[in-house]
Amino acid sequence: MSHKVSKKLDEEQINELREIFRSFDRNKDGSLTQLELGSLLRALGVKPSPDQFETLIDKADTKSNGLVEFPEFVALVSPELLSPAKRTTPYTEEQLLRLFRIFDTDGNGFITAAELAHSMAKLGHALTVAELTGMIKEADSDGDGRINFQEFAKAINSAAFDDIWG
């Protein structure tokens, strides 16, 4: 059944998921350990309790090998991605605001290139100058060189930051 669900995702969504998956697959063995999956979830702002995490692992690990492979990962996240309510805005405004505040380290209502670089490095994803400038350019729709909350929310919801994970 999970295979049928994944067929409904478009190629771009599958590629984005693959990039996210690969960036957290530290040893590049094609599977995520529980530690790697936990890091991925935290980077996405999802912080399940230990019980919720165990349930998530049990649900995802269909081979019962203690690892989450890419098809299992796709099967796990596909229902969320395909849900009509989630398709246009995968995050609540509260979640986006919380995430925005993490990146807006000085609290002035804008994310600068320096704040973005620092926050991504803290999340374990150091950015090259090209990645950093590309992300700012992609998200900064008014061209002022910084990202306000509306630009941030739009970028996150449209996966404009997919280069973060690659």
From Swiss-Prot:
<feature type="binding site">
    <location>
        <position position="29"/>
    </location>
    <ligand>
        <name>Ca(2+) 1</name>
    </ligand>
</feature>
<feature type="binding site">
    <location>
        <position position="25"/>
    </location>
    <ligand>
        <name>Ca(2+) 1</name>
    </ligand>
</feature>
<feature type="domain" description="EF-hand 1">
    <location>
        <begin position="12"/>
        <end position="47"/>
    </location>
</feature>
<feature type="binding site">
    <location>
        <position position="144"/>
    </location>
    <ligand>
        <name>Ca(2+) 3</name>
    </ligand>
</feature>
<feature type="binding site">
    <location>
        <position position="31"/>
    </location>
    <ligand>
        <name>Ca(2+) 1</name>
    </ligand>
</feature>
<protein>
    <recommendedName>
        <fullName>Probable calcium-binding protein CML17</fullName>
    </recommendedName>
</protein>
<feature type="binding site">
    <location>
        <position position="115"/>
    </location>
    <ligand>
        <name>Ca(2+) 2</name>
    </ligand>
</feature>
<feature type="domain" description="EF-hand 4">
    <location>
        <begin position="127"/>
        <end position="162"/>
    </location>
</feature>
<feature type="binding site">
    <location>
        <position position="36"/>
    </location>
    <ligand>
        <name>Ca(2+) 1</name>
    </ligand>
</feature>
<feature type="binding site">
    <location>
        <position position="27"/>
    </location>
    <ligand>
        <name>Ca(2+) 1</name>
    </ligand>
</feature>
<keyword id="KW-0479">Metal-binding</keyword>
<dbReference type="InterPro" id="IPR018247">
    <property type="entry name" value="EF_Hand_1_Ca_BS"/>
</dbReference>
<keyword id="KW-0106">Calcium</keyword>
<dbReference type="InterPro" id="IPR050230">
    <property type="entry name" value="CALM/Myosin/TropC-like"/>
</dbReference>
<dbReference type="InterPro" id="IPR011992">
    <property type="entry name" value="EF-hand-dom_pair"/>
</dbReference>
<feature type="binding site">
    <location>
        <position position="142"/>
    </location>
    <ligand>
        <name>Ca(2+) 3</name>
    </ligand>
</feature>
<feature type="binding site">
    <location>
        <position position="104"/>
    </location>
    <ligand>
        <name>Ca(2+) 2</name>
    </ligand>
</feature>
<feature type="binding site">
    <location>
        <position position="151"/>
    </location>
    <ligand>
        <name>Ca(2+) 3</name>
    </ligand>
</feature>
<feature type="binding site">
    <location>
        <position position="140"/>
    </location>
    <ligand>
        <name>Ca(2+) 3</name>
    </ligand>
</feature>
<feature type="binding site">
    <location>
        <position position="146"/>
    </location>
    <ligand>
        <name>Ca(2+) 3</name>
    </ligand>
</feature>
<feature type="binding site">
    <location>
        <position position="108"/>
    </location>
    <ligand>
        <name>Ca(2+) 2</name>
    </ligand>
</feature>
<dbReference type="GO" id="GO:0005509">
    <property type="term" value="F:calcium ion binding"/>
</dbReference>
<keyword id="KW-0677">Repeat</keyword>
<feature type="domain" description="EF-hand 3">
    <location>
        <begin position="91"/>
        <end position="126"/>
    </location>
</feature>
<feature type="domain" description="EF-hand 2">
    <location>
        <begin position="48"/>
        <end position="83"/>
    </location>
</feature>
<dbReference type="Pfam" id="PF13499">
    <property type="entry name" value="EF-hand_7"/>
</dbReference>
<feature type="binding site">
    <location>
        <position position="106"/>
    </location>
    <ligand>
        <name>Ca(2+) 2</name>
    </ligand>
</feature>
<dbReference type="InterPro" id="IPR002048">
    <property type="entry name" value="EF_hand_dom"/>
</dbReference>
<comment type="function">
    <text>Potential calcium sensor.</text>
</comment>
